[in-house]
Amino acid sequence: MNEKLALNDDILMKIEKPARYIGNEVNAVVKDRDSIDVRFCMCFPDVYEIGMSHLGIQILYGMLNSWDDVWCERVYSPWVDLDEIMRKENIPLFALESQDPIKDFDFLGITIQYEMCYTNILQVLDLAGIPLLATERGEDCPIVIGGGPCTYNPEPIADFFDIFYIGEGETQYRPLIDLYKKCRTEKTGREEFLRRAAKLPGMYVPRFYETTYHENGTIASFRPTEEGIPARIRKELVTDMTDSFYPMKPVVPYIKVTQDRVVLEIQRGCIRGCRFCQAGQLYRPVRERDVEVLKKYAMEMLKNTGHEEISLSSLSSSDYSKLPELIDFLIEECDKRHINISLPSLRIDAFSLDVMSKVQDVKKSSLTFAPEAGSQRLRDVINKGLTEEVILQGSALAFEGGWTRVKLYFMLGHPTETEEDIRGIAELSNKIAATFFDTVPKEKRVNGRVQIVTSTSFFVPKPFTPFQWAPQCTKEEFVEKAYLTRKAISEQLNQKSIKYNWHEADVSVLEGVLARGDRKLSQVLLYVYNKGCFYDAWSEYFHNDVWMEAFEACSLDPDFYSHRERPLDEILPWDFLDCGVSRAFLEREWQKAKNETISPNCKQACQGCGAARFGCGICVEPRD
């Protein structure tokens, strides 16, 4: 138990969900301060319920705490009610386990999953009493290190971090911490530690790099400022997933969180090669965990947590080679224990539907398809390996099996998209509804009709994808496309069976700016944060007018970052990073997209993306 909470009872009684801040959850790790050498605080810059659902944090938390010389604790962004109180009463941000101020730690590690959380990073630093700019931090400040998918273009937030860890976190934290201990013993100081850290694999230390610009605002050069600092940084990768660390005792929250279940990561990476998908490129090559190990992990974690549900985690679970064996095992074992099984990321085919009928309450569940584009032409452009025939066949099988609700996910604004492609969203939704009426006899229809929920998000080009050079639509173009989709749905024969939802355009445009921005955007982030912006990922706290004011005040044009097609010879802000996928491959895929040519998946034929040099996973395994 904590000797004393950082927040007194009066404060805890005033705020929403005080259990977010008191620690002491089941499986939380508490160590003796005097018996450890390094204190590390892991941060997810969003509200507790979202951060506690993140598998990456659980893996790193468990791994770091498995070492006798390190104590890893956790911190999340305080919700707006507590934020106000902490500022008013000068309460420093604290870690959950010890309730000690973050400023007393050796490291603050921040996982960065989403661009719209950038202002929350500033909130965390500010509340902790850590200078926002890395160059203004003294010897007594924690080393602030960033990781996660957004670090594949770290430049918009480079000024706020001492180090970025590029790649998967299981491989280089031990060498980094050993270096820190060595430098502390030698009393080298902060700057020398960072200089040495910059020479470790996967470590990017922004202060040792400089950017110059052309008059038109594009990058002229990006280079190290000192000898011995690498000009190019390659991502870190776990080559053997079966032997890598996995948390057998994940922390169990007191309150309901987004993912309140045991999460079993069955593989990392994806074979599919969708051209809009950043994760599919960043996590190459596909690497599987051994099925016998997964069986053992599942039972151990269920025993250690008391959770009543287990979920398989993967970008594409259907592509896991031992899926039938694993699912048969889980169905048998979980049925005995009254444990529910969640199976996301499954392709809709006869096998998947048979499995889902065994593990789900059909009457309560909905079936999900992600066609991503309304026409086959556009699905070929984005390399989405899903045909209309497969979608309709899967729908028919599902309706025969008792499903009456279908969720469809599309993106608006893909490169080369036409009005005909957009109308295809409405037409496909209508065809699925028609399939229900053609398949299910009238007397067997629940409530008389099927419910099709069609949702559209807006396309955001991301680094290290074939679409990294593509222009993004403007807000006005996005809104026009959404209105056209809504109108087209209203004209369909089965329009009463179709419900349409769409995303906010303002947020998508800003996400696109931050995703492909450069270091100049740090001044925009500082401006909006000082104007009171944080929790921008939450619509009720997003203030687009303040962001537009910031761009104007900083003499920067957001359209420069989002709305222009970038030439292939332009230096991109993230070009100094090596994610394993070659630029030549991405250029080939960009041209294939323009030619409406599909690429086979990794199991069908190697496309020479570059990931084979890691010497692991599907790249070295026999293909089907």
Give residue ranges: language-model regions.
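Radical SAM enzyme core and accessory elements
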Residues: 1-30, 34, 40-42, 491-624
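N-terminal [4Fe-4S]-dependent radical SAM core
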Residues: 11-41, 48-49, 206, 212-263, ...
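N-terminal pre-triad scaffold of radical SAM enzymes
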Residues: 40-46, 64, 250-276, 302, ...
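Conserved SAM/AdoMet-binding glycine-rich loop
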Residues: 42-43, 116, 300-407, 411-453, ...
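Flexible loop/turn segments at secondary-structure boundaries
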Residues: 48-51, 80-83, 116-118, 151-154, ...
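Canonical Radical SAM [4Fe-4S] cluster-binding loop centered on the CxxxCxxC motif
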Residues: 54, 256-292, 608-623
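A short beta-strand-loop structural module common to alpha/beta enzyme folds
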Residues: 69-81
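Glycine-rich beta-alpha loop elements in corrinoid/cobalamin-binding modules
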Residues: 78-223, 466-518, 525-540
